[in-house]
From Swiss-Prot:
One of the primary rRNA binding proteins, it binds directly to 16S rRNA where it nucleates assembly of the head domain of the 30S subunit. Is located at the subunit interface close to the decoding center, probably blocks exit of the E-site tRNA. Keywords: Ribonucleoprotein, Ribosomal protein, RNA-binding, rRNA-binding, tRNA-binding. Signal peptide: none annotated. It comes from Maridesulfovibrio salexigens (strain ATCC 14822 / DSM 2638 / NCIMB 8403 / VKM B-1763). It comes from the Bacteria. CDD domains: uS7_Bacteria (cd14869). This is Small ribosomal subunit protein uS7.
């Protein structure tokens, strides 16, 4: 931790097509080896497909998909005495977004379709309709927190 106070958050520029900071964050997480143009192409094509399927503005559908994947509570390990407890804690808004993006990308990469555009658009569509791997991960996280509610008094 720095001695001179908290490190300021970097300003994220909105993407050129939709003017969305969330889209920029997503493309940056999707990128491999600094190849931003490749990640942009994949993302925009996936959004185009999502817009066609949902008959809605693509960026609004994407934002709804991310909203459906955001976790509100998670568990953190806390050692008390000799035992380790899974303590439920609320998730900060910035962490909610980063977890949702991470889960969407990971589950899209593990899908069976051919090509990343098809995988990503399929995962977006599933998340938009509240199903799919990323939404299941969110529900599992919430279930874990619910099951360990008895240890909530160990919060720090």
């Amino acid at each position: 931790m720095p001695r001179k106070g908290p490190v300021p958050k970097r300003q994220i520029l909105p993407d050129p097509v939709y003017g969305s900071q969330l889209a920029t964050k997503f493309m940056n997480r999707l990128m491999y080896d600094g190849k931003k143009s490749v990640s942009e192409n994949i993302f925009y094509q996936a959004l185009e497909f999502l817009g066609d399927k949902t008959q809605e503005d693509p960026i609004k559908a994407f934002e709804k998909a991310v909203e459906n994947v955001k976790p509100h509570v998670e568990v953190k390990s806390r050692r008390v005495g000799g035992a380790t407890y899974q303590v439920p804690v609320e998730v900060r808004p910035d962490r909610q977004v980063s977890l949702a993006i991470r889960w969407l990308i990971n589950f899209a990469r593990s899908r069976g379709e051919k090509g990343m555009v098809a995988r990503l658009s399929g995962e977006f569509l599933d998340a938009y309709n509240k199903r799919g791997g990323a939404v299941k991960k969110k529900e599992d996280t919430h279930r874990m927190a619910e099951a360990n509610k008895a240890f909530a008094h160990y919060r720090w």
